[in-house]
Amino acid sequence: MEDSNASPRMSTEHENTEMHPFEYMFKHFKTQKVAISNAIRSTFPFLESLRDREFITGKMYEDLIDSCRSLVPVDKVIYKALDELEKKFDVTVLWELFNEVNMEKYPDLNPIRRSFECVFPNELSFQGIDRGNPNSQLSLEQGPSASYSQGSLNGSSLDLSSSEGWRSNDRRNSNLMQANQTENHQLAESPGHLDSCELQVQLNNGDATPESYSLLPQHEERAVQLNNEFQINPCFVQLIDVKKENSSFSLAGNQQTRARTNQNEDSEVIELSSGDSDDGENFSEATTTIPSQPAPAYSRTPPTLRTDRRGDTSDTESSIIIRRRKRTGRKKRERLGSYLIRNIKIPMKTSWKTAVLARSANTSSQRRRKRGPRIPREENADFGGAELPAVCGNVQGFLNKEKFKQGIYVRSIRSETGRLFTPMDFEIEGNCEKAKNWRQTIRCKGWTLRELIQKGVLQDPPRKKKENPRNPRQMKRQVNAL
């Protein structure tokens, strides 16, 4: 009875252990959402990458950007995007989250990525993953233990409630591995196949020593799928450094061959030297050109490549730009040289404070230009006559002193034509009515009437009109009317 009770307990525990990795991964992602949102300080390129890879829709992307424009904090916007990723969570979400671009842009994600690697060392492999292909191969070092994570590598959603799929995948993968090992062993024994074989080097997570390589016949041209095929053949390959997992090298006898990529721009030459294999044959060195890529921020071993660069001139270009800026600034200073502040020659290096103090200390700058009189005055003029010459604008006349004393409404000015004017009418006749100041506009021998009144030459006329004496006849009529 005890054995019968133990067997179902063992089966349930085995089922729970097979379901735990993805559940723990999902729970760990949920607990790290706040830390991830704090680590991502800007929306670009995180949201754009999620939209381009269809993790979020275009409408949701626009909503998130509009939230940022509405001054919503960036961490809250990123947290909302992580909520959407939680609904579609699988391993591809973690790959997209910790890709090379994000790790370079957001260095605060490094400790979070390391926490995932520490918790799930066999299920995750961020190192060397092809960003363009989410179905990239994992390291063969994981062996059959990575079978349950391979389903998520192909983008398929994991079923947390069933464990039969995991066990069936384990059995199928182990059988395929045994069949491929026997097939590769037969291929390795026949020397005729060596000329038409490709050496595929697969690296484990970021290490520089390959774990295994597989020899495939060239005429078969079949793709290696992670779910169903593993090619393992014992070999010793000595590498200087290789960045990518999926780099393949073709060997033809003892001659060197080159596998050229589609990109002909900035290239790096990586040397691969193979040691002696089990059958005693010595493979020659194979060189290949692969597109140069910057080392990821989270790489465990810094690359020690011997490179031959042709197009990478960023340092020289930046130094040239700096020299150009210095040269243009020097030319600008030479062109300006010195400048003048109120006839004071001050060099360019003099501070503004010194320039202002020097300007204030100069007495010539404090002098104001005095405007001279527009109409010249007669300094020794004689104002003793009964009439004085009067000028207003283009009109000339004569001012009678006696009539001028009687008041401003008395016609005291006679023009050259013989017409009589009051001072205000004479101002209007001279087209100076806008001034409305006849004491200032009418002049006698260059002196204004105001100045002559102040000097006592003329008497200030009263402002009231002189009342005319009433006609006695009119007064008599008014009395009779009463």
Curated annotation (Swiss-Prot):
Biased composition (Polar residues): 133-148, 250-264
Residue window of motif Nuclear localization signal: 309-326
Induction of expression: By interferon.
Bias type Low complexity, positions: 149-166
Cross-referenced InterPro entries: HSR_dom, SAND-like_dom_sf, SAND_dom, Sp110/Sp140/Sp140L-like
Phosphoserine modified-residue sites: S174, S190, S314, S318, S319
Keyword vocabulary terms for this entry: Cytoplasm, DNA-binding, Isopeptide bond, Nucleus, Phosphoprotein, Transcription, Transcription regulation, Ubl conjugation
PTM (free text): Sumoylated. Sumoylated with SUMO1. Sumoylation depends on a functional nuclear localization signal but is not necessary for nuclear import or nuclear body targeting. Sumoylation may stabilize the interaction with CBX5. Phosphorylated.
Cross-link named Glycyl lysine isopeptide (Lys-Gly) (interchain with G-Cter in SUMO), sites: K243
A GO molecular-function descriptor: DNA binding
Positions of the UniProt region annotated as Disordered: 131-171, 250-334, 357-382, 457-482
Locus of motif PxVxL motif: 230-243
Bias (Basic residues) ranges: 322-334
Residues with the Phosphothreonine modification: T209, T313, T316
One Pfam assignment: HSR
Residue ranges of domain HSR in the record: 6-121
Subcellular location: Nucleus; Nucleus, PML body; Nucleus, Nuclear body; Cytoplasm
Chain ranges of the SAND domain: 378-459
GO cellular component: cytoplasm; PML body
Entry domain remark: The HSR domain is important for the nuclear body targeting as well as for the dimerization. Contains one Pro-Xaa-Val-Xaa-Leu (PxVxL) motif, which is required for interaction with chromoshadow domains. This motif requires additional residues -7, -6, +4 and +5 of the central Val which contact the chromoshadow domain.
Assembly, per entry: Homodimer. Interacts with members of the HP1 family of nonhistone chromosomal protein, such as CBX5 and CBX3 via the PxVxL motif. Interacts with ETS1; the interaction is direct and modulates ETS1 transcriptional activity. Interacts with the MRN complex which is composed of two heterodimers RAD50/MRE11 associated with a single NBN; recruits the complex to PML-related bodies. Interacts with HIPK2; positively regulates TP53-dependent transcription. Interacts with CASP8AP2; may negatively regulate CASP8AP2 export from the nucleus to the cytoplasm.
Function: Together with PML, this tumor suppressor is a major constituent of the PML bodies, a subnuclear organelle involved in a large number of physiological processes including cell growth, differentiation and apoptosis. Functions as a transcriptional coactivator of ETS1 and ETS2. Under certain conditions, it may also act as a corepressor of ETS1 preventing its binding to DNA. Through the regulation of ETS1 it may play a role in angiogenesis, controlling endothelial cell motility and invasion. Through interaction with the MRN complex it may be involved in the regulation of telomeres lengthening.
Name of the protein in its database record: Nuclear autoantigen Sp-100
Protein source organism: Mus caroli
